[in-house]
Amino acid sequence: MIPDDVATELGRVVRRWQQLPLDRAAERVVGVHELMAQLAGEPLPDLGPAVVMDQLRVVVFDACRVEGGPPHLAEQLASLRLGWA
């Protein structure tokens, strides 16, 4: 269902997010919401940094249900993660 490259990068994003201090995660949640809104086609509720990775997983799964999924999704996830360095 989820292409291997997307699943790998999503796992990396989630692991990196779990390593971020709460204040840094709170500062970066906006970027996650921007990507989710792009994938979902509408803004999603802000449930805070503790839940945003669960939201991202669901949105990525739903986006990949369409044949082939969004182009360059793995690269978008990598860019998001690398922006937290």
Segments (PLM) and residue ranges:
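Short, charged early-sequence alpha-helical segments and their helix-coil boundaries
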Residues: 43-59
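Alpha-helical rod/repeat scaffolding segments in eukaryotic adaptors/tethers
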Residues: 22-29, 45-49, 66, 70
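Generic structural signal for short, flexible, solvent-exposed coil/loop and linker residues
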Residues: 2, 41, 45, 69-73
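Short terminal alpha-helical segments
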Residues: 1-37, 74, 80-81
